[in-house]
Amino acid sequence: MTLRDLKVGQSARIKAVGGEGELRQHFLDMGVIPGAELTLVKLAPMGDPMEFQIHGYELTLRLADAEQIDAEQIETRSRAHTRVEIIEEKEHPGLGEEGKYHVKGDGDPLPEGTRLTFALVGNQNCGKTTLFNQLTGSNQHIGNFPGVTVDRKDAPIRGRENTSVTDLPGIYSMSPYSSEEIVSRNFVIDDHPKAIINIVDATNIERNMYLTMQLLEMEIPVVVALNMMDEVTGNSGSIDVNGMEAMLGTPVVPISAAKNEGVDELVRHAIHIAKYQEKPGRQDFCDENEFGGAVHRCIHAVAHLIEDHVKAADLPLRFAATKIIEGDHLILDRLGLDENEKETIEHLIIQMEKERGLDRSAAIADMRFNFIEKVCENCVVKPKESKERIRSEKIDRILTGKYTAIPCFIGIMLAVFYLTFNVIGAGLQKLLEMGIDALTVQVGKLLTAANVNVVVKSLVMDGIFAGVGSVLSFLPIIVTLFFFLSLMEDSGYIARVAFVMDKLLRKIGLSGKSIVPMLIGFGCTVPAVMATRTLPSERDRKMTILLTPYMSCSAKLPIYAFFVSAFFPGKGGLIMAGLYFLGIAIGIIVAMVYRSTLFKGNAVPFVMELPNYRLPGAKNVGQLLWEKAKDFLQKAFTVIFLATICIWFLQSFDMHLNMVKDSQDSILAAIAGLLVPIFKPLGLGDWRICTSLISGIMAKESVVSTLEILFNGSVTAAITTRAAASLLVFSLLYSPCIAAIASIKREMGHRWAVMVVIWQCVVAWLAAFVVHMIGGIL
C-alpha cells in the first residue's frame, strides 16, 4: 500500500520513498524516511492535499506525492501524552558566560578588534525573526506561517560593539530546495560567519535538530538556542540541557524569544564561542556498530578521498562528504573531481547501499534521525499535547472542514471588506477628512490675511492641500485593512488558506503556496513579489510574480473609496468586494493563458508545515500598523507631494510659462491630449483623467490627488457613473506602481518588467472596455 491508501485517523510505517531529485531529498530532510511512523489527520476540503502528523508536527502532501511513498499500516498511534519520569533538573553551568569559562582550553582566539559576525539559522516559523528583533532591537515583521523571511537582514547585537547578526531565511536542511534556502546555505558556506546561532523549536526537537546536525558539520562555532521553552515546561515537558550539550558537543541555551528570556545568556555564549573560535566537539554522528557500520565506513572513505579537493574549494570536509553521498550536484561541481575519483566514490556508495539496504539519500537521512532519536531518548521528555495544538484542532474542524472551509474563507474576506470600507475604516476616514478640511480652511484664511502671492497661495491650496490632503484622508482605510490582514497572518490562518486552496490553484498551474504571496499582494505588491522566493520552482515563482499585481494592493484603496463614495453611495462594501474578486477572476484567466503558453507544465508538489493557531501579539500587530502608516505618510510627503507640485505646475502654466486661467490651455493639457484617443472608447476621453492615470504609475495614491487638483473637487460633475465604473476597473488592473515594477525587475529582469507594464495595460483596457459596453446596455 501507499500513503494515499490511508484513511483519516489511520497510522502507517514508511517502507520506501519514491520519486527523485530535489523533491525526494526534501521529503527525506522533512523526516519522511523509511521506518518513520505517521498518522493521516485529515484531507483538504477538496480531497487533496493530505495532512499527516509525523515527528510531532503536521505536514501536508498531495495525493500524487503520497502515492510514491510505500507504507504498511500499523495500529493507530495514540496521540495522548505518555508520562515518563521527568528529567532531574540541573543547574545550567553557563558555558562560556562572560567569556570566563573556556570549555576545551584549546580555543583559537581571534585578534582583538575582529568584527564578530553571526548567522541566525533555523527552520521556518521557529521564532527566528523574533529572536533577531530581541538581539538587535530591530522591528522586522513576524508572521505565523512558514517563509516570512525571504532575504537576509543584518544588524548589530544590541549593546555589543563590533558585532553583526544576519537573520537568514528559514530552512529545513542544507539541501538547496528553494531560492531562500540557497540564500541561507550560500551565506553559511561562502560568507564564513564567525559563529552560528542555531534556533531550535524546543516543542519539536525531532524535526529541528536535523538542520542542527548539518550545521555542526560546517566547522564553524555553533550555539544552539532552544526556543519556546516556556511552552515545553508549561505543558509538562522538560529537556536535560546539560546532557544535550554533552551529546552534541556544543553549547545549548534554553530561551523564550517572545518573552526575552535567556537571550542575554545566549548572547554571552555566542560572543564567547565566536571570540575563541570554539568549534563543535562532535561532527561524527554515524555509529560504526549500527547496521554493520556501512554508512560509517562510506562517509569516512569518501572524506579521505576528497580531503585535498575540499581544502582547495574552501569547504568543510564532513559536510562535503555527506552531501556528495546524498548526490548534491552543487557541492560535487565545486570540488572538481576527476572521473577516476568519481567512479571510486560511486563504487563506495553503491556498496554502502547494498549493505545498508537503503538508497544513498535515505541512508544519510536515516543516520541523522537515528542520532536525533538517541538525543531525544536521553535528554527530552516530550510535552503533552499542548493547549495550542488542541485549540488548533478544534478551530480547524471549521476553518478547514470539508463543507465549511471555502464558505468560511469567503465570509472572512467579505467581513474584512465590509468592516474596512463601511464601518471602521469609513468612520475613521470621515473624522480625518473633517480635520483636514478644517485645517485647509484655516490655512486659506491665514494666507489671505497675510496677502500671500496668488501663485504661492494656489500652490499651497490647489496643489499641496488638494493633492496630499485628499490622499491622507484614506490613511484609516489602509491601516484598517492591514490590521485584519495582520490578524489573519499572525493567527496562522493564511497557512490554512494555502492548504485549502491548493487543489483549486493547481487547476490554473500553481501551488497552494502561491496563495501566500497573493494574499500579501492585497497589502502591497513589493513584499508580495519578494515572498515568492519561498516557492521552490522557478516556474511557479515567475508565474506567481506575474499574477500578484492582479491582487488589488492597498495603494489603490484611495481610488476605490473616492469613486465609490462619489458615484455609488451606500454600496461601498459590495463594490469594493466586487473589485477585489474581479481582480482575482482576471488573474485566474491570465494564469490559464500563461499555463498554456509561457509556463507549460505542472506546479511543483505541495509540501508545507501547518503551524498551530496563535493569538496575534498586540505588539506585533501594532508594530506592523505603525510601519504601514509610516510608509504611507512618507510616500504622501515625498512621492505624492512632488507629484502634486509637478501636476499643479503643469496645469497652471502654458508653454510660455504664463499662468493660465483655464487648465485647458496648460502644458499638461497639451501633453495628455495625445492619450485621449486611446481612452475615449472607455468613456474616459478627458485629458485630466489620462493625466491622473499616468501619475498613478509613480504611486497609485496620486491618482486621487491629481484628480482633485485638476477637477477642483468637481469630478462628479465631469464624468458619468458609467465612466466611473470603467475607470475603477482600469485602475484595478493597469500597470503596477514604479516600486512594484522595480521589484519585478530585480526578481525577473528588465524584459519581464516591461512586459508586465504593457500586458497589464492591455488587459486593463480590454476589461474597462467590456464594462463600459455593458454599462451602455444596462
Question: Which residues does each PLM region occupy?
Answer:
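Transmembrane helix-loop junctions at the membrane interface of multipass transporters and ion channels
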Residues: 550, 554-577, 739-749, 770-778
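Hydrophobic core segments of alpha-helical transmembrane domains in multi-pass membrane transport
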Residues: 408-419, 481-486, 564-566, 579-593, ...
